[in-house]
């Protein structure tokens, strides 16, 4: 009998050919912002997992754009929950949990949430 307990409430889904662009804002004026991009591994309306060459520190707040195959972009803000270097290819998996959705510009927009929900309907089980 397995002791593994699935804690995920939302089903993850994959969006073919999507990439994640991210930017970690500089905390001090003499720092440069950290930017990069990676392949989207899977997605929910609450977060994203993607693969990069660069390690991003857990706890970091990122501005993200999910770029779809048709060049549509979904802007999001989230916090890095964890990162892990993969033994297979040396790439790094990063998981980001999105902050709340609200009309306040300091939060993710409801427009972005609607786009995520549409992607979920289209690619669930993909």
Regions of interest found by a model, annotated:
Residues 42-44, 82-84, 100-102:
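A generic structural motif
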Residues 15, 88-126:
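C-terminal output/interaction extensions
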Residues 67-71:
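Short, charged beta-turn/beta-strand-edge "cap" motif at the junction between a beta-strand
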Residues 24-58, 63, 95:
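Short strand-loop-strand
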Residues 38, 76-83:
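Short beta-strand-centered aromatic/proline hotspots
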Residues 15, 36, 62, 74-76, ...:
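Hydrophobic core residues within well-ordered beta-strands of beta-rich domains
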Residues 1-43, 115-126:
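N-terminal helix initiation/capping motif
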Residues 24, 45, 83-89:
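Short, conserved beta-turn/loop elements at beta-strand boundaries and strand-helix junctions
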């Amino acid at each position: 009998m397995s002791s593994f307990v699935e804690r995920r409430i939302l089903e993850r889904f994959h969006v073919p050919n999507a990439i994640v662009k991210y930017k970690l804002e500089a905390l001090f004026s003499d720092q440069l912002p950290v930017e990069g991009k990676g392949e989207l591994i899977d997605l929910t309306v609450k977060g994203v997992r993607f693969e990069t060459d660069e390690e991003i520190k857990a706890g970091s707040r990122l501005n993200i754009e999910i770029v779809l195959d048709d060049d549509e972009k979904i802007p999001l803000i989230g916090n890095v929950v964890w990162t892990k270097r993969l033994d297979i290819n040396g790439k790094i998996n990063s998981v980001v949990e999105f902050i709340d959705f609200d009309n306040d510009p300091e939060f993710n927009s409801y427009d972005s949430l609607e786009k995520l929900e549409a992607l979920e309907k289209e690619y669930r089980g993909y």
